[in-house]
UniProtKB/Swiss-Prot annotation:
Alphabetically ordered keywords of this record: Ribonucleoprotein, Ribosomal protein, RNA-binding, rRNA-binding
Keyword flag Hydrolase: no
Purpose of the protein: One of the primary rRNA binding proteins, it binds directly to 16S rRNA central domain where it helps coordinate assembly of the platform of the 30S subunit.
Domain of life: Bacteria
GO cellular component, one term: ribosome
Any one GO MF annotation of this record: rRNA binding
The protein's assembly and partners: Part of the 30S ribosomal subunit. Contacts proteins S5 and S12.
UniProt family annotation: Belongs to the universal ribosomal protein uS8 family.
Name of the featured protein: Small ribosomal subunit protein uS8
Annotated InterPro entries: Ribosomal_uS8 (IPR000630), Ribosomal_uS8_CS (IPR047863), Ribosomal_uS8_sf (IPR035987)
Amino acid sequence: MSTHDPISDLITRIRNAQMRAKSKVSTPGSKMRANVLEVLKSEGYIRGYATLEHASGRSEIEIELKYFDGEPVIREIERVSKPGRRVYASVKNLPRVNNGLGISVLSTPKGIMADHEARDANVGGEVLFTVF
């Protein structure tokens, strides 16, 4: 099954799995999803992920979700830029999520990165989603 917006699909799968207190969730594999998950892992929002290759040639990513005292580490995850309405930000206008307690994940010319990394690299880009 193909999805029109793989990032929204990934976010929804994570949100739904955490509402059901699942320890792991699977999603179809792609480089974009793996790069987004790498940012979430480096920022401490998920435990990790693994890419699984099937005999049919399709790949799947298994995500290990993270909890603290039984509560999900990700309190809020929200898509900002959508296929019908793209949202771009220059380095000067990068949004701060809850006064710096959360992060914005951006797609920049230098790859997918968190907002503080984009500020350090002095690049702007498409604001994919925010996490708190």
